[in-house]
């Protein structure tokens, strides 16, 4: 299987102003296959979110290298990494990271601003995405007037607005209702059918049945890899 992301002995160390270091990740070697739904599991504090931050280029490893489509991006500048996030990676944060008073469509359109997309097109693309997520009645409503499940769907729409090749989601089903969870699963399956790669960090058992590659972390180490047949 072709790897879209590969890590080579990556480590993340935090010093936190104390003499002893905190090693959040330790010597992680993994390959994330293209066009797969990948699940990252492990107990709280095992390094799941830290790993997502590194492979999404939000943060940099203390040691080791990260490859995207075979190219070492470890020494890319911040500007280069920002361009990768804009064009290649869609991020779904556990905390949603929405602007609470802006209309839903403007939140969704936010990633289009640096690309110079005109307002009419931004709104059109955002509304289309919100309709796909069954939020057609919430287009002009701000997130502060929405339920947790609706806010998560707005965050998903924002992550997908640039048609990213890779979608990365951190605990995407936490604090949302059953309907929103099913919508999310349907979206992920649809994305995969279009050749996208989906990487999810979650404790939720709903992802176990649909995931094809499962990485298990413990105490900052990769302790198990499970490969399944493509679905």
Region locations from a protein language model:
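Helix-to-loop junction immediately C-terminal to a conserved catalytic motif
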Residues: 56
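Conserved ABC transporter NBD signature motif
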Residues: 64-72
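Conserved signature/switch motifs of ABC ATPase nucleotide-binding domains
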Residues: 86, 141-144, 162, 194
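Short coil-to-helix segment of the ABC ATPase nucleotide-binding domain corresponding to the Q-loop/switch region
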Residues: 102-110
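Conserved ABC ATPase signature
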Residues: 142-146, 150-152
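Catalytic Walker B motif of ABC-type/P-loop ATPase nucleotide-binding domains
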Residues: 167-170
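Helix N-cap at the start of a conserved alpha-helix in ABC-type nucleotide-binding domains
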Residues: 178-180
């Amino acid at each position: 299987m072709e790897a879209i992301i590969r890590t080579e002995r990556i480590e993340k160390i935090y010093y936190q102003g104390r003499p002893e270091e905190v090693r959040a990740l330790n010597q992680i070697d993994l390959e994330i296959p293209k066009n797969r739904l990948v699940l990252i599991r492990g107990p709280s504090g095992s390094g799941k979110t830290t790993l997502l931050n590194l492979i999404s280029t939000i943060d940099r490893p203390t040691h080791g290298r990260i490859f995207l489509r075979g190219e070492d991006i470890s020494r890319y500048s911040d500007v280069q990494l920002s361009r990768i996030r804009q064009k290649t990676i869609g991020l779904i944060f556990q905390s949603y990271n929405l602007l609470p008073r802006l209309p839903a469509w403007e939140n969704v359109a936010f990633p289009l601003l640096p690309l110079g997309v005109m307002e009419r097109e931004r709104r059109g693309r955002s509304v289309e995405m919100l309709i796909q997520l069954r939020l057609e009645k919430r287009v002009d409503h701000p997130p502060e007037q929405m339920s947790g499940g609706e806010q998560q769907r707005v965050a998903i729409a924002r992550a997908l607005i640039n048609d990213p090749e890779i979608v990365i989601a951190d605990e995407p089903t936490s604090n949302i209702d059953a309907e929103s969870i099913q919508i999310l699963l349907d979206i992920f399956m649809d994305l995969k059918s279009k050749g996208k790669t989906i990487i999810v960090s979650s404790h939720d058992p709903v992802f176990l049945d649909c995931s094809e590659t499962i990485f298990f972390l413990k105490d900052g180490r990769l302790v198990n890899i499970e490969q399944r047949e493509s679905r």
